[in-house]
A protein has these predicted regions:
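Classical N-terminal targeting signals for secretion and organelle import
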Residues: 1-24, 41-42, 67, 78, ...
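Amphipathic alpha-helical segments
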Residues: 19, 25-101, 109, 113
Length: 135
């Protein structure tokens, strides 16, 4: 149908869209946090550092993952465990850093926002999975 073809065209256009640079993503995330949590200037500077560290680590991980994928190398069960373990350790460290910067009220709100974002992401992933299985 024409409608189905339009949907595919839109998906392709989305893939061609330019991605934001890590710096742009960090800047937008910082501004959103500033608005949502009412961050003061010193908090903004500290959060910006945390976001930059996270971004650098994420870029390095993605580069490694892409290089392995291009070579056709899949991680072993042990490597997957190590990666997940490392990711959780980093999440704990980030949480501790953020907690030092924010007030208890801000931290509670940040935790709530993260939880809501995870739930929204889960819903979107389920919708995508349902859409793919229907095709």
């Amino acid at each position: 149908s024409t409608y189905a073809q339009e949907g595919k065209k839109q998906e392709r256009q989305g893939a061609e869209r330019e991605r934001l640079s890590p710096e742009q993503r960090n800047q937008l995330q910082l501004k959103k946090m500033t608005l949502d949590l009412n961050l003061n200037e010193s908090q903004q500077k500290e959060i910006a550092k945390i976001l930059e560290e996270q971004s650098a680590k994420r870029q390095a991980e993605m580069a490694t993952f892409k290089a392995n994928k291009d070579k056709g190398v899949k991680p072993t069960a042990e490597e997957r465990f190590a990666m997940k373990n490392k990711k959780l350790d980093e999440a704990i460290a980030v949480k501790a850093k953020v907690q030092k910067v924010l007030t208890p009220e801000q931290f509670k709100k940040w935790e709530d926002m993260k939880k809501e974002n995870r739930e929204n992401m889960k819903e979107r992933m389920e919708k995508r999975r349902d859409k793919k299985s229907a095709e």
